[in-house]
Structures are given as structure tokens and as C-alpha cells.
Amino acid sequence: MAAALLARARGPLRRALGVRDWRRLHTVYQSVELPETHQMLRQTCRDFAEKELVPIAAQLDREHLFPTAQVKKMGELGLLAMDVPEELSGAGLDYLAYSIALEEISRACASTGVIMSVNNSLYLGPILKFGSAQQKQQWITPFTNGDKIGCFALSEPGNGSDAGAASTTAREEGDSWVLNGTKAWITNSWEASATVVFASTDRSRQNKGISAFLVPMPTPGLTLGKKEDKLGIRASSTANLIFEDCRIPKENLLGEPGMGFKIAMQTLDMGRIGIASQALGIAQASLDCAVKYAENRNAFGAPLTKLQNIQFKLADMALALESARLLTWRAAMLKDNKKPFTKESAMAKLAASEAATAISHQAIQILGGMGYVTEMPAERYYRDARITEIYEGTSEIQRLVIAGHLLRSYRS
């Protein structure tokens, strides 16, 4: 089986994984240490990120530059369609592998990390799970190699966390659906060649009247708003999608009418593992920066790392990071084992995003004045971390999800 797997493998990423069939199911927490194949994957992604992303990350951030060439190379490695089956031109790997790879990319450049996350989790994810065979061929295969990327249009100007309150509408007209409304905060919007859009097809049914659609970009009736000038993740584009009598074929309905809310929620469960992994990368980069600086900066006749106060800070940073990483891996492995993971993905996203914010904050504190200037990357990590507590469900939403599952478990 392993030989056949490798014979079908494509690209340097798969060749780096060795001879074991690494799609074996994992027993959650059977070992704190990663399987050898996943360790090799981590090193491959780290080498790529250090060569291709670290040298340009500050420039991408400063000039709001989309990393076109690097995204293409990531597609060639298989990083843009990691759990998509090989028959659809994906890498055919598992979600633990995806989490590990995304952390390494985000450690080098969080903007590139979210570009990767959106294409894998939010765009390809729902089509892979709910799409027809024809839709998978049309809307997945061309988006695996870096030539094209997709986006995900759920949030609206008047409802971000309240995903069931969509004001965008879709009505049937002959052989078409006609979309009207505005979607907000759409990542990858300016570079995307397609989007998954959620719109109300029956307002009387509230969230049970929401449906999902596949929309090519550009297309008549769809215009892009201005690129948002953001605090962080500045190399990824964020803009509104404005639908004005946007007509798409009837066969572009994803799933069945009224399934949109279910599709969105299950997609966000997957996406939260991605954002947790992005946050882990930011947190790890912040800790690396703080330790390196503290080791080389002398105060009172000794390196900062000799000061107990600095040691305590570093210990707390490492504790938060490792705890969040284990929660994230657990959520990924539950998904790989086809077990429920909604609560666990919310826990992972909450823990990792808050860890990234706290660790990047403390990194600046350790660097002092040097942490506040662009000469060092600590300030970029701090800016990039903040969004991880907001998008794909705020920290408050994650706590509601966790509490809901917790209370139901006590009542059952």
C-alpha cells in the first residue's frame, strides 16, 4: 500500500514523506511525539518557509503585497489542497498534517498562512464534503496547484457572528439563481477565482432557509469593494463582495436548498483548526524572537535570560503555546478519525488565538523598545495575532460553543 501511495505521489512534499502509509488513523494522544512522517513534513514546510517567506515577510506586510510566486510554489508542493484526494489533484493527506504545515507557513508569514487556510478549509472544504462529483471536478481540481485560489463569503456588514441572519438573497429565475446583497471581510477576495457564497432562499425559514452557492470570479453582477487597510495580515486581501442581480447557473447550488447554514457551520469547524494552526505559528515565532533577543541582550552584567522575571515570562509563554498546540492536534486527529470535533475545534481556536495574542504581547515587553520598531518582527507578530481572536468566530462565540456542548453533556 505504501509503495502504491508513493507511486501516485506528486511533488516534493510527498517525496519527502518517506515510505510509510501516513494516512493511518491516529489514536488521539496515543503519543505526544508526532509520527516520523509528520515530523518530516514539518521540516519540509519549515525549510520552504525559511527560504521563500522569511526573507520577504516584512516587505509583504509593509507594501500589502500578495505573495503570488510563493503561493504558486505552495500549490506545487500540495500545500493548497492538503486533504483533497489525489484523484482530484490534491495531496491526499490528513488534517493533522494540514495543521502542522499551516503552523510552519504562518510562523514565517501569517498573511500567507491565512491565504493557505482559506483555500484549504473554507473554499475547498465545503465543496469536498457537500459537492457533487461534477462540482468537485469543476471547482476543486483547478484550485489545487496554485494557479487559482478561492474564498468564502458568509459574513455581512450587519451580521458577522450571527451567521444565520443572512440578508443576501438568492431567487430562482428559470435556469438560474439571481443573487443580491453584500458580503463583508472576505479574505482572498481580490485574488480569488471563485467563492462559496451563502444567501437566503427562503427568509420565512430563517437559518433553515439559507443555501450555499458556487460563484466564479469575476462574473457579471459581482463587484469588489475596496481593499481594507488592516492592522495585520496585510499581505492578504480583504474586501466586500457586492452582488447586484448576479446570475449563476442552477447547478451552482452547493448541496440542497436550505442546507447552507449546516454547510457553513461544519465548514467553520474545519476552519477553526486552520486558524488555531495559524495562531500557533504566530505564537511560536514570537517566542523564538523573545528567546533569541533575551539570550543576546545583557542587563545588569548578564543575559536577560538570567533574570528570574524573564524566565517566568518565557515559561508562561511556552506553557500557553504547548497547551494550545495539543488542543489543536487533538481536534485535527478527531476529525481524521471521523469523530465529532466541534467543541474541540472551538477550544483549539480559542486557546491558540489567545495564546498568540498574549505571547506576542510579552515578546514585545521582553524586547522593550526594540519590540516597538519595524526593525524587529515582534511588532508584526503582535499585529498579526490580533485577528485570530476575531475571524472565523470571535473568542466570545467560541466560549458559547464550548459551554453549549459542555452543558449538553451534563444533561444527557
Curated annotation (Swiss-Prot):
Q: Which cofactor does it need?
A: FAD
N6-succinyllysine is found on 51, 129, 262, 306
| UniProt key word Ribosomal protein | no
Residues bearing the modification Phosphothreonine: 27
Keywords from UniProt, A to Z, are:
Acetylation, FAD, Fatty acid metabolism, Flavoprotein, Lipid metabolism, Mitochondrion, Oxidoreductase, Phosphoprotein, Transit peptide
Annotated metabolic or biological route of this protein: Lipid metabolism; mitochondrial fatty acid beta-oxidation
For the protein in the UniProt heading, the enzyme class is oxidoreductase
According to its UniProt record, the EC number is 1.3.8.1
Define the transit peptide region by residue numbers. 1-24
Q: Which residues does the Swiss-Prot or TrEMBL record annotate as the active site?
A: 392
| Keyword Signal among record annotations | no
Q: Name one Pfam family in it.
A: Acyl-CoA_dh_N
Catalytic activity as recorded in UniProt: a short-chain 2,3-saturated fatty acyl-CoA + oxidized [electron-transfer flavoprotein] + H(+) = a short-chain (2E)-enoyl-CoA + reduced [electron-transfer flavoprotein]; butanoyl-CoA + oxidized [electron-transfer flavoprotein] + H(+) = (2E)-butenoyl-CoA + reduced [electron-transfer flavoprotein]; pentanoyl-CoA + oxidized [electron-transfer flavoprotein] + H(+) = (2E)-pentenoyl-CoA + reduced [electron-transfer flavoprotein]; hexanoyl-CoA + oxidized [electron-transfer flavoprotein] + H(+) = (2E)-hexenoyl-CoA + reduced [electron-transfer flavoprotein]
Q: How is the cofactor bound here?
A: Binds 1 FAD per subunit.
**Where is the protein found, in the record's own terms?**
Mitochondrion matrix
InterPro entries in the cross-refs: Acyl-CoA_DH_CS, Acyl-CoA_Oxase/DH_mid-dom, Acyl-CoA_Oxase/DH_mid-dom_sf, AcylCo_DH-like_C, AcylCo_DH/oxidase_C, AcylCoA_DH/ox_N, AcylCoA_DH/ox_N_sf, AcylCoA_DH/oxidase_NM_dom_sf
Residues the entry annotates as binding FAD? 152-161, 185-187, 297, 308, 365-369, 394-396
Disulfide-bonded cysteine pairs: these are: none
Family label: Belongs to the acyl-CoA dehydrogenase family.
Q: Write out the function statement from the record.
A: Short-chain specific acyl-CoA dehydrogenase is one of the acyl-CoA dehydrogenases that catalyze the first step of mitochondrial fatty acid beta-oxidation, an aerobic process breaking down fatty acids into acetyl-CoA and allowing the production of energy from fats.
- Protein known as: Short-chain specific acyl-CoA dehydrogenase, mitochondrial
Name its species: Mus musculus
- Lineage of this protein's species? Eukaryota, Metazoa, Chordata, Craniata, Vertebrata
Name the gene.
Answer: Acads
